[in-house]
């Protein structure tokens, strides 16, 4: 069950209206997870500084159980997420940051329990 959070200082009118939907589909493909298990949040107009500059930028946080735990996995994921973000947001790679956070099943709650017991 991947959780993807995208923060950007771009105003809403400069972000494609369907970005959340596209990011959901891209995440499902990149992480080899069913689309219906992917959770996406997009926040626009956020006050942000990346690399000492408040020029247009974005940060993407990807957390998931089992698929973001190694450098090798994340290197592959990073290349694909960077391609998606540069193509869909019009940002240069030096204005994009990614963070990968591996989760354990006991850290994700669903249906009044945690994933360990589902």
Curated annotation (Swiss-Prot):
Q: Where in the cell is it found?
A: Cytoplasm
Give its E.C. classification number. 4.1.1.84
Q: Which residues carry this modification: N-acetylproline?
A: 2
Q: Biological process (GO) annotations?
A: melanin biosynthetic process
List the catalysed reactions: D-dopachrome + H(+) = 5,6-dihydroxyindole + CO2
Q: Which InterPro entries match?
A: Macrophage_inhib_fac, Tautomerase/MIF_sf
Q: Is the keyword Glycosyltransferase in the record?
A: no
Q: Which residues form a coiled coil?
A: none
- Keywords, comma-separated and alphabetical: Acetylation, Cytoplasm, Lyase, Melanin biosynthesis
Give the Gene Ontology MF terms in alphabetical order: D-dopachrome decarboxylase activity
Which GO cellular component term is one of those annotated? cytoplasm
- Which purpose does this protein serve, as stated in its record? Tautomerization of D-dopachrome with decarboxylation to give 5,6-dihydroxyindole (DHI).
Q: Which family does it belong to?
A: Belongs to the MIF family.
| Quaternary context | Homotrimer.
The name of this protein is D-dopachrome decarboxylase
Organism equals: Xenopus tropicalis (Western clawed frog)
Name the gene for this chain: ddt
